[in-house]
Design a protein with these regions (language model features):
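Terminal substrate-recognition subdomain of acyl/acetyltransferases
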Residues: 1, 111, 116-174
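A conserved beta-strand-loop-helix scaffold within acyl/acetyltransferase catalytic domains
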Residues: 1-89, 136, 168-174
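Glutamate identity and glutamate-enriched acidic tracts
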Residues: 10, 25, 46, 54, ...
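Phenylalanine-focused residue identity feature
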Residues: 15, 23, 36-37, 93, ...
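Generic signal for short, ordered secondary-structure residues
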Residues: 16-19, 83, 99-100, 143, ...
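A generic secondary-structure signal for well-formed alpha-helical elements
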Residues: 19-30, 67, 104, 108, ...
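Acyl-donor binding region in acyl/amide transferases
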Residues: 72-140
Length: 174
């Protein structure tokens, strides 16, 4: 794992190649461009951790974590982006979950967020939690419609998270 200034321009280029390749394989252009990552490296470089996977000495996959509160007791690592040049069983989980969790343990980061979506993460003991986001919608009627929907969705999502929590693979002491 590389952190902050340890991540070279060549590493960023490799990451973007992996990231773009993964989107291309799903028939989509990447939603973030190379310039976005170049700016993040320049302006917020200390907040990133790059995990590389290699096969026979060649890099084949990368994941990129965002770290908030670095060095503090409330630091959080967020699994954010990933990509691969080759396909191997469990490569995604190794690169995006197992290695980042190991990095967190080694660096005293108490919390790892594996990213939004994906009930498949539960089998890896990444349990669902609510997340928040902020958006500004310029059109008043559209903003109201979205607000109404989100209010209804909130109840359904809370119930769904509760149902998923009941199926945790972790042992409970209650």
């Amino acid at each position: 794992a590389l952190h902050g200034t340890q991540i070279t321009p060549e590493d960023w280029a490799l990451f973007y190649r992996c990231y773009a390749q993964t989107y291309a394989e799903h028939g989509n252009p990447p939603y973030l461009n190379r310039d976005f990552f170049a700016r993040m490296a320049k302006d917020m470089g200390e907040h990133w951790v790059l995990i590389r996977a290699e096969r026979s000495g060649r890099p084949i996959a990368c994941s990129l974590l965002a770290v908030q509160g670095w060095g503090g007791s409330d630091a959080v690592a967020y699994g954010r982006y990933w990509g691969s040049l080759e396909h191997h069983d469990s490569l995604h989980f190794e690169t995006c979950y197992y290695q980042p969790i190991e990095w967190c343990l080694q660096h005293g980061v108490q919390r790892f967020e594996g990213g939004a979506q994906g009930e498949h993460k539960m089998s890896r003991a990444l349990l669902p939690v609510g997340t928040a986001s902020a958006h500004w919608i310029a059109h008043p009627a559209f903003a109201q419609a979205i607000g109404d929907f989100l209010q209804r969705e909130r109840q359904g999502m809370a119930q769904y998270v509760e149902e998923l929590q009941e199926r945790t693979p972790l042992r409970r002491n209650d």
